Protein backbone atom coordinates (compact mmCIF):
# COMPACT_ATOMS: atom_id res chain seq x y z
CA UNK A 1 0.00 0.00 0.00
CA UNK A 2 1.43 3.32 -1.04
CA UNK A 3 0.29 6.25 1.08
CA UNK A 4 2.12 9.49 0.51
CA UNK A 5 1.78 12.03 3.32
CA UNK A 6 2.70 15.71 2.96
CA UNK A 7 2.56 18.00 5.98
CA UNK A 8 2.36 21.78 5.52
CA UNK A 9 0.64 21.07 2.21
CA UNK A 10 -0.41 24.67 1.58
CA UNK A 11 1.45 27.88 2.43
CA UNK A 12 0.11 29.38 5.67
CA UNK A 13 -1.98 32.09 3.99
CA UNK A 14 -3.64 29.56 1.65
CA UNK A 15 -4.19 27.15 4.55
CA UNK A 16 -6.05 29.89 6.43
CA UNK A 17 -8.05 30.71 3.31
CA UNK A 18 -8.97 27.02 2.80
CA UNK A 19 -10.06 26.78 6.44
CA UNK A 20 -12.21 29.90 6.08
CA UNK A 21 -13.78 28.49 2.93
CA UNK A 22 -14.83 25.18 4.49
CA UNK A 23 -15.92 26.82 7.73
CA UNK A 24 -18.30 29.16 5.91
CA UNK A 25 -19.48 27.05 2.96
CA UNK A 26 -22.91 25.42 3.26
CA UNK A 27 -22.76 21.67 3.85
CA UNK A 28 -25.53 19.35 2.68
CA UNK A 29 -26.58 16.14 4.37
CA UNK A 30 -26.53 12.98 2.30
CA UNK A 31 -22.92 12.12 1.45
CA UNK A 32 -22.57 8.37 1.40
CA UNK A 33 -19.64 6.00 1.28
CA UNK A 34 -20.77 2.70 -0.19
CA UNK A 35 -24.55 2.55 0.16
CA UNK A 36 -26.73 5.46 -1.03
CA UNK A 37 -29.47 4.42 1.38
CA UNK A 38 -27.08 4.87 4.34
CA UNK A 39 -25.76 8.45 4.29
CA UNK A 40 -22.72 8.88 6.51
CA UNK A 41 -22.48 12.64 6.80
CA UNK A 42 -22.59 15.97 5.04
CA UNK A 43 -20.43 17.40 2.31
CA UNK A 44 -19.53 20.61 0.53
CA UNK A 45 -19.21 20.14 -3.23
CA UNK A 46 -16.72 22.37 -5.01
CA UNK A 47 -17.24 23.25 -8.67
CA UNK A 48 -14.50 22.94 -11.30
CA UNK A 49 -14.79 26.65 -12.08
CA UNK A 50 -14.18 27.64 -8.44
CA UNK A 51 -10.77 29.17 -7.81
CA UNK A 52 -10.11 26.81 -4.89
CA UNK A 53 -10.69 23.78 -7.18
CA UNK A 54 -8.12 25.03 -9.69
CA UNK A 55 -5.58 26.01 -7.02
CA UNK A 56 -5.86 22.71 -5.17
CA UNK A 57 -5.46 20.78 -8.45
CA UNK A 58 -2.24 22.68 -9.20
CA UNK A 59 -0.77 22.23 -5.72
CA UNK A 60 -1.67 18.52 -5.60
CA UNK A 61 0.09 17.98 -8.95
CA UNK A 62 3.15 19.87 -7.65
CA UNK A 63 3.30 17.89 -4.38
CA UNK A 64 2.39 14.38 -5.59
CA UNK A 65 4.41 13.06 -8.56
CA UNK A 66 1.86 10.38 -9.42
CA UNK A 67 -0.63 13.13 -10.37
CA UNK A 68 1.66 14.73 -12.97
CA UNK A 69 0.43 12.71 -15.95
CA UNK A 70 -0.91 15.35 -18.39
CA UNK A 71 -3.87 13.10 -19.21
CA UNK A 72 -4.84 12.80 -15.56
CA UNK A 73 -7.93 14.81 -14.60
CA UNK A 74 -9.26 15.91 -11.24
CA UNK A 75 -12.88 14.85 -11.55
CA UNK A 76 -14.40 15.61 -8.16
CA UNK A 77 -13.62 17.79 -5.17
CA UNK A 78 -15.65 17.92 -2.01
CA UNK A 79 -15.29 18.42 1.71
CA UNK A 80 -16.47 15.78 4.16
CA UNK A 81 -18.29 17.28 7.12
CA UNK A 82 -18.81 14.92 10.04
CA UNK A 83 -20.56 15.69 13.28
CA UNK A 84 -19.73 13.89 16.53
CA UNK A 85 -20.90 10.26 16.65
CA UNK A 86 -21.62 9.94 12.94
CA UNK A 87 -20.50 6.60 11.52
CA UNK A 88 -18.67 6.79 8.21
CA UNK A 89 -18.49 3.44 6.41
CA UNK A 90 -15.63 1.55 4.80
CA UNK A 91 -15.49 2.40 1.10
CA UNK A 92 -13.37 2.82 -2.00
CA UNK A 93 -13.42 5.98 -4.09
CA UNK A 94 -13.00 4.23 -7.45
CA UNK A 95 -13.68 0.74 -8.73
CA UNK A 96 -10.58 -0.97 -10.15
CA UNK A 97 -10.38 -0.83 -13.94
CA UNK A 98 -7.44 -2.52 -15.63
CA UNK A 99 -5.07 0.02 -17.15
CA UNK A 100 -6.69 2.99 -15.40
CA UNK A 101 -5.16 4.61 -12.33
CA UNK A 102 -7.23 6.47 -9.76
CA UNK A 103 -5.97 8.51 -6.82
CA UNK A 104 -7.60 10.16 -3.85
CA UNK A 105 -6.09 13.14 -2.06
CA UNK A 106 -7.35 13.83 1.45
CA UNK A 107 -6.66 17.28 2.86
CA UNK A 108 -7.22 18.38 6.46
CA UNK A 109 -7.84 22.16 6.50
CA UNK A 110 -8.53 22.65 10.22
CA UNK A 111 -6.19 24.83 12.29
CA UNK A 112 -5.66 22.65 15.35
CA UNK A 113 -6.29 19.11 16.46
CA UNK A 114 -6.27 17.08 19.68
CA UNK A 115 -6.17 13.27 19.80
CA UNK A 116 -9.56 13.26 21.55
CA UNK A 117 -11.11 15.09 18.58
CA UNK A 118 -11.02 11.91 16.49
CA UNK A 119 -11.11 12.30 12.74
CA UNK A 120 -8.58 9.57 11.99
CA UNK A 121 -8.45 7.98 8.56
CA UNK A 122 -7.99 4.21 8.51
CA UNK A 123 -6.75 2.19 5.55
CA UNK A 124 -7.67 -1.49 5.27
CA UNK A 125 -5.01 -4.20 5.17
CA UNK A 126 -5.66 -7.94 5.13
CA UNK A 127 -5.47 -8.39 8.91
CA UNK A 128 -5.07 -4.86 10.32
CA UNK A 129 -5.53 -1.20 9.53
CA UNK A 130 -3.08 1.61 9.05
CA UNK A 131 -4.26 4.85 10.61
CA UNK A 132 -3.32 8.46 10.02
CA UNK A 133 -3.97 11.40 12.28
CA UNK A 134 -5.78 14.35 10.68
CA UNK A 135 -2.98 16.81 11.35
CA UNK A 136 -3.78 20.39 10.33
CA UNK A 137 -2.70 21.24 6.78
CA UNK A 138 -1.82 17.61 5.99
CA UNK A 139 -2.57 15.90 2.68
CA UNK A 140 -2.51 12.17 1.95
CA UNK A 141 -2.47 10.77 -1.58
CA UNK A 142 -3.33 7.11 -2.19
CA UNK A 143 -4.74 4.68 -4.72
CA UNK A 144 -8.48 5.39 -4.92
CA UNK A 145 -9.24 1.65 -4.94
CA UNK A 146 -7.94 1.18 -1.37
CA UNK A 147 -10.65 0.56 1.25
CA UNK A 148 -10.65 3.33 3.84
CA UNK A 149 -12.85 5.04 6.39
CA UNK A 150 -12.86 8.04 8.68
CA UNK A 151 -13.83 8.44 12.31
CA UNK A 152 -16.08 11.27 13.40
Residue positions per predicted region:
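Non-heme Fe(II)/2-oxoglutarate
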Residues: 1-72
